[in-house]
């Protein structure tokens, strides 16, 4: 499992997992050679333009696939992004899907969004994503994070968020939500 992380904040909470800060072939091979079945690649792509993000994710996908073929190991990507729903979504997941399918011949027929960051007070309850301020949970779309000039959004629920960010390519009514009790 190759986790691409768009910002260094989240990786501060991982334990006993390697976090690589480049995607050179030797580095990716190190990840594949580990005993762990998972490693992180810190892309810092939240600070990139869409063009820079596209270039980086295409490069990473190509290197990961090349190393996977050389080592005879299968792989899958996870795109880890901001717990307040900012970032290059859906661009990054679309690029990873396109490259993975082209490189492996396998089809990805779905995507899982799982916004949660306990340490930062980010929770999703009944399909609404919240940011904790003190003891109060505020819907993320009502916070300053949703007003971000680059990655802003107005959607109140996760299905609406998907529809908004995909510009209607995926309708809110077609999003399946699974709540934990």
Where are the language model's segments positioned?
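Short loop/turn segments at strand-loop or loop-helix junctions that form parts
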Residues: 41-46
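Cap/lid and interdomain-hinge subdomains that line or gate substrate/regulatory clefts
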Residues: 1, 5, 12-15, 28, ...
């Amino acid at each position: 499992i190759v986790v691409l992380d768009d910002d260094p904040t989240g990786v501060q909470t991982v334990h006993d997992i390697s976090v690589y800060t480049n995607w050179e072939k030797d580095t990716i091979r190190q990840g594949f050679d580990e005993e762990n079945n998972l490693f992180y690649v810190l892309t810092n792509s939240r600070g990139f333009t869409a063009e820079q993000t596209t270039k980086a994710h295409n490069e990473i996908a190509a290197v990961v696939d090349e190393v996977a073929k050389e080592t005879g190991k299968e792989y899958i990507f996870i795109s880890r992004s901001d717990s307040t729903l900012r970032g290059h979504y859906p661009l990054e997941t679309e690029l990873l899907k396109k490259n993975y399918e082209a490189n492996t011949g396998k089809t990805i027929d779905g995507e899982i969004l799982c916004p949660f960051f306990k340490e930062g007070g980010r929770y999703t309850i009944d399909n609404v994503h919240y940011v904790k301020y003190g003891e109060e949970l505020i819907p993320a779309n009502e916070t300053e994070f949703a007003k971000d000039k680059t990655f802003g959004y107005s959607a109140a629920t996760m299905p609406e968020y998907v529809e908004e960010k995909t510009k209607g390519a995926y309708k809110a009514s077609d999003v399946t939500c699974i709540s934990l009790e």
